[in-house]
Amino acid sequence: MMQMLGQGFLVSLQLFVLTPLGSIPLGVPVAFMRMSKIAPLRWIARIYISVMRGTPLMLQMFAIYFAPYYVFGISLTPDSKWTACVVAFIINYAGYFAEIYRSGLQSIPRGQYEAAEVLGYSRMQTFLYIVMPQVAKRILPAMGNEIITLVKDTSLAFAIGVGEMFSTAKALVASQVSMVPFAIAALIYWVFNFVVEMLLGAAEKKLDYYHD
């Protein structure tokens, strides 16, 4: 039982790692599009963010998994489930991260940009050395909340047949007629979440050199 749950946890861990690797950088251009003065770009970003945040992640997984077959007639392969799952998680979380970035960037007073210009800073230097340190500190709690939510959201992958830890525990409960696999899975999720919270707390302390 523990071996099977361990294998399921590794799948959940892979999804947990791959999602931020894709969604954190993807959220950056979406955030800048959202703040763009070019109306079409701004509206594309607004619609994207609205769809990602306004529809269930599970529904997005189903759409990405089945769309190639029903729309283009592309045959589904054993790898299709995993690919659809990762893509759905990345584009979903990118929508949330984009809004977090936007709120962080727009929270910086305009006067700081003007002061940097007077001091001879270029736009890039202003962004890297003045704006980014403040934005990073301000958005970290919100980013942390999304990362913690992601730990639990990995269990949604079972909906399209990805063998992560929850689906493994569910199969074990059915075969063994026992709730023990669920209890062990819950404990693993809790420990994993606790470790993530500790790491995020350490990161917040690391950025505590700047005080509003």
Model-predicted segments: where are they?
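Transmembrane alpha-helices and adjacent helix-loop boundaries
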Residues: 1-212
